[in-house]
Amino acid sequence: MLRSSLNQNLAKRCLSTANNNGATLIKKRHPIRNFILKTALGATVFYAGGVALSEYNEKFAEYFRTYVPLGDDLVHNYEVYRYGPDSKLGEGISVVGLREMIQEVVYRNPTKFHPEGGEIEIIQEVVPPTRLLTLELITVDDERMDPKFSSLVKDLNSTIETIINQNIYLTDSQIGYILECYSTLTAAVTEYNQQLQNNMNLIIKEKTTKAVNELNSEYEKKFTDKESELTGKFIQDFNNFKDQLEQKKANELNTELRANEQTLLAKHANEVALLSITQVEEFTKIIKEKVDKERDGRLGQLQELDASVTSLSKSVDKMNNALMKNEVITQMITLLSSMKQKLNEAGTTNEGLSLEKEIDRIKLLSSIVPLATSSCKCSSKCKSNCKCSKSCGRKKTLMSVGISELDNAASGKLILSNEQLYNRWNLLEGDFKAASLLPANPGILGHFTAKMFSLLLFTKRGVSVDGTDLDSVYAKVSENIRLSKLDKALADVVSLKGWPHVVCQGWIDDAKRKLEVEALIDVLDSEVRAL
């Protein structure tokens, strides 16, 4: 109680001081003084709280004394102030200074903690300690121990452990007195526990009996009320169910009667309708016989007229197919001629020529009239518009193969003109000069040296019949491209080996693509003209 009141008063003083100083500082607006006062106030609150908490928690007191600057001195001064000459010896002694006070009183300075500070007789002869004070913890064997009593036993054991940890050395008489007091305390605790358990058992028994009686009375009352309620509810539900069942059966009976009535009426109507239909059929049969006789007599030439119309329709279909085939062939010849003209003309763009639209047009025309597919292989030797099963195989003709290969070669790709191929070949002039100066197995240094010295070479022009060096080959290819002899130029370039062939690989692909497209267009043009 004294510690708690002291801490409360100290906290109130600190808070009141902080509030007063804060109001004054805000009014005067002195930032330096305000900072100093706040720092001092914070340090005061910190140390005051640490000292106050050290009185209640031994672990925190040890940490505060060891690691906080001036913590040990403040705690010591507080204990001297609180437990000094003005207090009675033995009252309110903290566990922290218990060992020191016992040693001072018994062995060293008996006047240091004297309550009155008066003169006392000093014992000249000090009895040396004979053995260490040892105590056992209080043990109460009861599983149903009250929580509050268990907390009390734990607090007593904690105090005993603290006294044991002080390692106090006393005489036999002092130890005997302490052990006697300890035995009395243990007996009192055991007796209190026994009385507490007996009282608790008695109270539990009385309350249990009272609760059981109350529950029995309440159960009987609830059972009677519930029985009456369920009986009334059952009678009411039974009456409601009986009324609903009677109403349901009455409705079902009325529904069945109406259904039977409708069935009989429908059956009667069906019989009347059947009789009418039979009469109509007989009348129709008579009329048909009359019409057949009249047609055989007056319309005998109708079948011959129908056969003539059918023959005329077949002739018209054949003529239509022939005209459509002729138109498709004409458009395909015109389209292939325009493709040839585009390939021979100079390119209008640097990227090349795209033939996707023309190829799609050729595929569409070939699908209108079956020109590109052959007749089937079946034994019946069907025509080109075979309608046999899927198992009927078809052998591809040159027309179908040509269209497919043209689609693969030119679809999604650009075709270069002769002028564009010639310009791209001229762009390889520097690489050819460097390649002509390369050794057998050139490295990075060899390529660099050849590139530097190639700037000093002159470009050879014209055709050299016997020339086999790279400059002669370059000049021959240039001349063939200029004269539109792309096949010979491509053959000379393909015959190159090593690094020159690698340099010309892109040009070779473009030239091959152009020659393939031209050859396929020529093949398709020949096939279309032969139809």
Swiss-Prot record:
Keywords: Coiled coil, Membrane, Mitochondrion, Mitochondrion inner membrane, Transit peptide, Transmembrane, Transmembrane helix. It holds the Pfam family Mitofilin. One of its GO terms (biological process) is protein import into mitochondrial intermembrane space. One of its GO terms (cellular component) is mitochondrial crista. It is found in: Mitochondrion inner membrane. Residues 54-531 are mitochondrial intermembrane. It is a single-pass membrane protein. Its main location: mitochondrion. Residues 1-15 form a transit peptide. Residues 210-267 form a coiled coil. The chain crosses the membrane at residues 35-53. Residues 16-34 are mitochondrial matrix. Belongs to the MICOS complex subunit Mic60 family. Component of the mitochondrial contact site and cristae organizing system (MICOS) complex. Component of the MICOS complex, a large protein complex of the mitochondrial inner membrane that plays crucial roles in the maintenance of crista junctions, inner membrane architecture, and formation of contact sites to the outer membrane. Plays a role in keeping cristae membranes connected to the inner boundary membrane. Also promotes protein import via the mitochondrial intermembrane space assembly (MIA) pathway. This is MICOS complex subunit MIC60. The gene is MIC60.
